[in-house]
Amino acid sequence: MQVSNSMSLNDEEDDIEFINYIPLLASPINSSTCSTSIHDKCPFKQHISENGQNFGSAISSNISQRNFKTLRASHLSQYRDCNRENNTEDKNVISTGIAVNEKYQSVLKLKEKAPQISSAAKRKSFIKERGMLAKCFLARLEDEVFQGRLTSSLEKKEIGIVWSKSFSTTAGRANLKRNNKDAPLGKKTYAYIELSDKVIVTKERLYNTLAHEVCHLACWIIDNEMQNPHGACFKAWGKRIMNNMPYIEITSKHNYDIDFKYKWLCINEKCNKLYGRHSKSINPQKQVCRLCKSQIKQICPKIKQPNAFQIFLKENSKRLRKLHPHITHKELMKKLSDEYHRTKDAKQNVSKSVSLISSSDL
């Protein structure tokens, strides 16, 4: 199946069309899911160099083919998520002297003036719109790459999206279900993609993971290839998607930096193994580093040290409870508080008297 390229860049006016054509998609980091080595990237990433000449020759003559790759990256960078706080790369692209139109420069100025948004606000905004973003992206893949063949044999004529909280490190998983496993694909076939609520936290990860999982579904539904999950069939579909959408990158397995809520570090400087969990499931008092058997310490979130009053409560609550077994918890806390303040005042008076004696001796 050949993918037709609907872009036509023949003159200077089409340069503006090229900028407008780039959708509001973030540039990829590295994508995908499943069970292969992290560094096992697909060899078809050369699609940029293969098709660079077709794009470069169509753009205005004042932009050389050598600079096309940089121009493409600069255009895409302007449409990244607003959570990119550092736009020095975009400024460097402008300073290289590449010919860019006024519309592009206005986009850069608006980006520089945009207010800074907190990470919590970004996450909340992404959660609100991620369902619609995923649905629109899958519809575009079905229309431009698969030409309607992917969902035509499904009962609901669409691919479902399920957000999972149980995926702690896996970005996504494609699923194809039939009521009768021996029956061919038909009306009783359901397809859906599970996405990690903890890993998929940006648009770029969403689009790259969806593209990866859709390649699996295409192998199963269109080519009936069920054996090799990341074989020639998977790579062929991945190449077609990336040729049609250069801002998408499909690899065998993702290497996203997952933002774990809890982190522990091995105290052995030669090891320094970092452990991350979404819940407080590691107890440094009972568990050690699995590599060097050294102790580990919690580094995130930082453990707050107890203040003087908390230490006093821990040391004296049992004693006062034995002295007053029938009082309520509120009354017990009142007695502890009064005793703490008396002890604190006594210590301060002693320190003042000591300082006065020392000053008189001088």
Curated annotation (Swiss-Prot):
Q: Outline the extent of the SprT-like domain.
A: 135-299
Query: How is this protein annotated for GO cellular component?
Result: cytoplasm; nucleus; spindle
- The reply to whether Methyltransferase figures as a keyword in the UniProt entry is no
Which InterPro entries would you find in this protein's record? HMG_box_dom, HMG_box_dom_sf, SprT-like_domain
Keyword tags:
Cytoplasm, Cytoskeleton, DNA-binding, Nucleus
DNA-binding region per UniProt? 306-348
Query: Which biological processes are named by the entry's GO terms?
Result: protein-DNA covalent cross-linking repair
Where would you find this protein in the cell? Nucleus; Cytoplasm, Cytoskeleton, Spindle
Does this UniProt record's set of keywords contain Nucleus? yes
Which Pfam families is this protein grouped with? HMG_box (PF00505), SprT-like (PF10263)
Q: Name one GO molecular function term.
A: DNA binding
Please report the organism this UniProt entry assigns to the protein.
Answer: Schizosaccharomyces pombe (strain 972 / ATCC 24843)
Enumerate the Gene3D superfamilies for this protein: High mobility group box domain
- Which top-level group of life is the source organism from? Eukaryota
State the name under which the record lists this protein: HMG box-containing protein C19G7.04
